């Protein structure tokens, strides 16, 4: 079985014998079936209402016409999609916090200040975040601060300014 991507709507793989049935069991216990094609490939749709998340395990077995069942194959779902770049509200000169909006609650925001120092914060349930300006760092008119958002899988967004 190929490693499924978080949020995917299909799971794919390669079987041993064309015409055999593939049964995939999803993390919530639901199953889906597919057939091994002439080229050996198969595809099974993720059932409606089932979501594949980073770290979930998906299993598959192949059954031939005689009812023989293969050993179970297991794949762990991976998340390789970076979050969207966070928005940064323009801070005023002398501000002691930088605020903005992130794309997913719980993600980590890392702000880089003009002097190269960094600070971190967490995206809240409402999508907002705030990061304290490090001690010894002063924001002046025209200074640019950047922010990136990192999800639980370690995917890092583009910079937001």
What feature does the model see in each segment?
Residues 1-161:
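Ser/Thr-rich low-complexity repeats and stalk/linker segments
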């Amino acid at each position: 079985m190929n490693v499924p991507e978080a949020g995917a709507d299909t799971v794919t793989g390669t079987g041993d014998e064309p015409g055999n049935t593939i049964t995939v069991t999803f993390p919530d216990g639901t199953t889906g079936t597919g057939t091994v094609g002439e080229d050996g490939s198969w595809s099974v749709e993720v059932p409606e209402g089932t979501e594949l998340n980073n770290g979930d395990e998906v299993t598959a077995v192949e059954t031939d016409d005689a009812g023989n069942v293969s050993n179970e194959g297991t794949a762990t779902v991976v998340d390789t999609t970076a979050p969207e770049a966070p928005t940064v509200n323009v801070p005023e000169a002398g501000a002691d916090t930088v605020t903005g909006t992130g794309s997913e609650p719980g993600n980590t925001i890392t702000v880089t200040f003009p002097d190269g120092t960094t600070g971190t914060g967490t995206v809240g349930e409402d999508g907002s975040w705030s990061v304290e300006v490090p001690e010894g760092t002063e924001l002046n008119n025209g200074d640019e601060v950047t922010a990136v958002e990192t999800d639980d899988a370690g995917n890092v967004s583009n910079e937001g300014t």
